[in-house]
Every structure is written in C-alpha cells, then in structure tokens.
C-alpha cells in the first residue's frame, strides 16, 4: 500500500469514491461500504493504489503505443487533455468498429495497450483489443464486469470531476515515472484543466 497521491479530501470533493446502487461480484473487493440509500462507496485507498499501478505500467510503453478511448461524454475532454500531456493516441467520442481489427480501415491503428473510461460504454474497443491480445486498463465503477479487463482502476467513471481527476493523476504519475517530472515537482496543470467545460 502506498501513500495517497493527493489529500483524501480532494478525492472526496471530486466524488471519485461515489459508486452506483448496483454492484457486481467482480467489483465487490473495491467497495468500502454501502450507504443507507443503497449507494455503494468505493475504497479511495484501492483507487489510489490502482492509479499508481496503472501509471507504472503505462510509463513502460512508448506514448505512441498507448490508445486511450472514451465514448462517455464526460470522459472525452479528460482523454483529449491526457493525450496532449502524455503524447498518447486518443479516441474521444465514437469508437468506429474495426479501428483495431480492420487493416483496410483508413484510421486502423495497432496500439500495444488500451485504456478505456468505461468497459461497458467502450465495449467495442475492449472486444477488439482482446481479439488482438492487447492488454486493457479500465476505469471501473461498482456495476462494471471485469472480463477482458487486465488492470482495474476502481473509480466513479461517470462523474465529470471524478473522471478528470483520474486522468490528471494518471498523466502526472506517468510523467513522474518517465522522469519528466520529479516526485516533488508540481504539475503545471490542475484537474479542472482536464474537465469538460459546461
């Protein structure tokens, strides 16, 4: 277990721990408690530790070999900003079937690892990655199934602020792992820079 990347209150303010009223057996181990209204609350320590694990893994790949996908509206701005900061390929918005499997498709790409904002809404990308043996890192909420997911980041993958915070933390950690930022150096961007503006 590692130290928190940011103070606990910042995680809580972004709603990173807020799950849904549904839960899957797969996600049970990441659930801290169930509120009286039936809402499942994620364990912030698990979220924090999995962000660190994912960043370490992603930092071992060339930026050009990483594809980050989000069909979910609140994930599109964070994914674009993450791509700008880390140099990774991104597909914010609709994922066209065949992007990873059809060499005849004009925008066909062959990443070595895939990151998705929600394995359910980004299921086409996950399926194509699995067909090609590409590992999948996924932001997963309490109701997600983990089949075809290799690295789980247990977080609220529906909230605008929560998704932005996760991609901000991932970007910062990857830059630290790559030695672009030192561990005590401040990141010159804020989580709000990753948020969808409404």
From Swiss-Prot:
Please provide one cellular component term from the Gene Ontology annotations of this protein: small ribosomal subunit
CDD domains given in the database record? RPS2
Q: Does the keyword Ribonucleoprotein apply?
A: yes
Determine the domain of life of the protein's source.
Archaea
Q: Does the keyword Ribosomal protein apply?
A: yes
Biological process terms from the Gene Ontology for this record are: translation
What does the UniProt keyword field contain?
A: Ribonucleoprotein, Ribosomal protein
Identify one Pfam family in the record.
Ribosomal_S2
Task: Please provide, alphabetically and separated by semicolons, the GO molecular function terms listed in this UniProt record.
Answer: structural constituent of ribosome
Q: Per the similarity annotation, which family is this?
A: Belongs to the universal ribosomal protein uS2 family.
What HAMAP family does the database record attribute to this sequence?
Ribosomal_uS2_A
Name of the protein in question? Small ribosomal subunit protein uS2
What's the name of its gene?
Answer: rps2
